[in-house]
Structures are given as structure tokens and as C-alpha cells.
A protein has these predicted regions:
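Short acidic, glycine/serine/threonine-rich loops at helix termini
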Residues: 66-70, 121, 147-154, 205, ...
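Phosphate/pyrophosphate-binding betaalpha-module
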Residues: 140-179
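Solvent-exposed alpha-helices and their adjacent loops that cap or buttress functional pockets
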Residues: 43-50, 101-103, 128-131, 167-169, ...
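Conserved active-site "lid/cap" helical segment
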Residues: 1-53, 234-249
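Active-site-proximal gating segment of KS-fold condensing enzymes and close homologs
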Residues: 7, 54-108, 149-165
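Condensing-enzyme catalytic core mediating Claisen C-C bond formation in acyl metabolism
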Residues: 168-249
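Beta-strand segments within the central parallel beta-sheet cores of soluble alpha/beta enzyme folds
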Residues: 29-35, 46-50, 54, 107-112, ...
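Active-site-proximal alpha-helical scaffold in enzymes
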Residues: 11-23, 90-93, 108-142, 183-205
Length: 249
């Protein structure tokens, strides 16, 4: 835990909750002592699930709070270097989560800004379709409004005109609404288990959703500007793919 930044801790906690909700078991993990005694050293996925389970960590600001905290602390007279800094700066919740649960499938971290978790879902579907694994645990987390990062990230979003300036939450929280004047900066975590068809049902679990189609592309434009015509055409292409998937069911 000490070697993870705050965002990674949030992501790992969400991931463990998702495993429970998906009915994926964690069984005792053992090792032999020098005397030949078997002792429990943790909990992990059964061997039959380990190699077929991948992990994707989706985050925009993971690890940045650790760096700012360390730089701030270095100004103090009694400063001592934190030997865990590198691991905390990397923000590799995907690797740490896989280590904790023993997931040996494909593993990566992605940053697509506000679309990170959405992109991760598309990547998970691709992995499963290509046969790289049978399931993917997606971890999505950020702590942009924490005491360490908020003054920097908040100022950055305000400078680009991307953050809402409304004083009341009711006036600011208007997703997909013409009255929306920007995003609300916050913190949180989510985790999803995306699986090949039939696996959840085989465990007696009713899936909460089905992925009919995904698409992720880039408009090759400045990151704070939108090519609305290109976005509209890509949404149409995604909907066409989803309609075909529905017809095939």
C-alpha cells in the first residue's frame, strides 16, 4: 500500500469490489517455508482463471500527487528521500492489482484524458475478440480534486475553459445538456469486469450490460478543440456497428 499513490489505491480497491460483484473468487495463496510448512501469503485468482484474466488501468493523473508531495517535502530541513517514490510516481495500479490477485493475462495502463475508461472498454473487447484473454478487469480512477493536485489541475482546466464555474452543483452537473458550461473536477474510482460471452452466466452471474460495439479514434486536432463533424461521423459509424451486432443476436 505504501508504494502506491492515492489514485492507484482507489483503483485497486474498486477492482477488488468488482471481482466480488462479478462472482470471481480469490483463493488462498501459499508458499513453503524452509521447514517445509505451508503458510498462507495472500489471496489470488484460481490457476484456471489467472492466465486468462487481463487488467487495464485507465487514469489521467495517476502518480502526479506523489511527485508534488515529494517535491514539497524536499523543501523541509528534515527531509528524507522516500525510497518508494519511483513506484508511487509511476501510478501502475494495473501492475500492482495483477500482483495482488495473481492475474497473468495482458496488462497495461492508458491515458486518454476524460475518455480513458471508455477507451479501456474498447481495448478490453479487442483483447477478448482477438483471444488474448477471456476477461479484463478495468480499473478507472483519478484524484484531481485532492488537496495536492486540485490547485494545479483546477487552474489548468479553468485556463482552458473546460471547467464549470457554476456555484451550485445543480447548475454545473448537466452532462449532455445544452446549458452545460464545463466539467466538474473531482475524484473517484470505478472498476468493470468485461468477459467473453457466456462466462458470467456459467458462474451463475447475470451480466449488467452487453458490449454491442466500440470505437476509438482521434480527430488529429488540438486537444482542447473539437472537430464536431468528425466526431458526428464516428458516432454514426459506431451506431451502425452496434445495429449490426443487434441484428446478429
Amino acid at each position: 500500500i505504501d508504494s502506491m499513490d492515492e489514485t492507484s489505491r482507489l483503483a485497486v480497491a474498486a477492482g477488488l469490489t468488482a471481482l466480488k460483484d462479478a462472482g470471481l473468487p480469490l483463493v488462498p495463496r501459499y508458499r513453503l517455508t524452509t521447514t517445509g510448512k505451508r503458510v498462507t501469503v495472500g489471496w489470488s485468482l484460481p490457476e484456471t482463471l489467472a492466465a486468462e484474466t487481463g487488467v487495464i488501468f485507465a487514469s489521467a493523473f495517476a502518480g502526479q500527487d506523489a511527485l508534488i508531495e515529494e517535491v514539497t517535502a524536499s523543501a523541509q530541513e528534515d527531509y528524507k528521500f522516500n525510497h518508494r517514490l519511483l513506484l508511487r510516481m509511476l501510478g501502475i495500479a494495473n501492475s500492482r492489482f495483477a500482483e495482488i490477485i495473481g492475474a497473468r493475462g495482458p496488462n497495461t495502463k492508458i491515458n486518454s484524458a476524460c475518455a480513458s475508461t471508455t477507451t479501456a472498454i474498447a481495448m478490453a473487447q479487442d483483447w477478448i475478440t482477438l483471444g488474448r484473454c477471456k476477461r479484463v478487469v478495468i480499473l478507472g480512477a483519478d484524484n484531481a480534486s485532492g488537496s495536492t493536485l486540485f490547485e494545479w489541475i483546477g487552474s489548468g482546466f479553468l485556463a482552458t475553459g473546460a471547467a464549470s464555474t457554476e456555484a451550485r452543483v445543480e447548475d454545473a452537473a448537466l452532462p449532455f445538456d445544452k446549458r452545460r458550461d464545463g466539467m466538474i473536477i473531482g475524484m473517484g474510482a470505478v472498476a468493470l469486469v468485461v468477459e467473453a460471452p457466456g462466462l458470467a452466466e456459467a458462474r451463475g452471474i447475470e451480466p449488467i450490460a452487453e458490449v454491442l460495439g466500440t470505437r476509438f479514434v482521434n480527430s488529429a486536432l488540438h486537444p482542447t478543440r473539437l472537430d464536431v463533424d468528425h466526431i458526428a461521423s464516428e458516432v454514426d459509424a459506431l451506431l451502425d456497428r452496434a445495429r449490426r451486432a443487434i441484428e446478429e443476436l
